[in-house]
Amino acid sequence: MAPSTKAASAKKAVVKGSNGSKALKVRTSTTFRLPKTLKLTRAPKYARKAVPHYQRLDNYKVIVAPIASETAMKKVEDGNTLVFQVDIKANKHQIKQAVKDLYEVDVLAVNTLIRPNGTKKAYVRLTADHDALDIANKIGYI
């Protein structure tokens, strides 16, 4: 009598094991890298502050004053560049946006430096379609 196939496969599963053997992955590094887990976006039930803080730096606070020294005038005439004293906390993006909004000009680049007296100076280079001399006249520091 031949044993039934179902019984034979059950016997084989008991002897061998139904899961089989898993090939182990060889670790080549000594550091264990934790896998990235799901990070859900925050959805707060209520605001933690009753009133949001007012804007710390608006356009009029970013630009303190134009600088009208001889070297600054040379930059205006030769380099199509305006020179401003700006707030110490203002970054290049804020300076660019402030000049764009206040004087209706397109800005090509902004270079900044901290002066020895602790103030920040910004060199604002304008695009070719805007003349720095005209803008300086409009501002009123020539």
UniProtKB/Swiss-Prot annotation:
Coiled coil (UniProt feature): none
- Cite a GO CC annotation: ribosome
Query: Which GO BP terms sit in this record?
Result: translation
Write out the entry's keywords from A to Z: Ribonucleoprotein, Ribosomal protein, RNA-binding, rRNA-binding
Q: Which SUPFAM superfamilies match?
A: Ribosomal proteins S24e, L23 and L15e (SSF54189)
Could you state a single Gene Ontology molecular function term?
structural constituent of ribosome
Query: Domain of life, per the record?
Result: Eukaryota
Give the transmembrane region(s). Answer: none
- InterPro entries on file: Nucleotide-bd_a/b_plait_sf, Ribosomal_uL23-like, Ribosomal_uL23/eL15/eS24_sf, Ribosomal_uL23_CS, Ribosomal_uL23_N
> Which is a Pfam family this sequence falls into?
Ribosomal_L23
NCBIfam families attached to this UniProt entry: PRK14548.1
Q: Give the record's family classification.
A: Belongs to the universal ribosomal protein uL23 family.
- What this chain does, per the record? This protein binds to a specific region on the 26S rRNA.
Q: What is this protein called?
A: Large ribosomal subunit protein uL23
Q: Which organism is it from?
A: Cyberlindnera jadinii (Torula yeast)
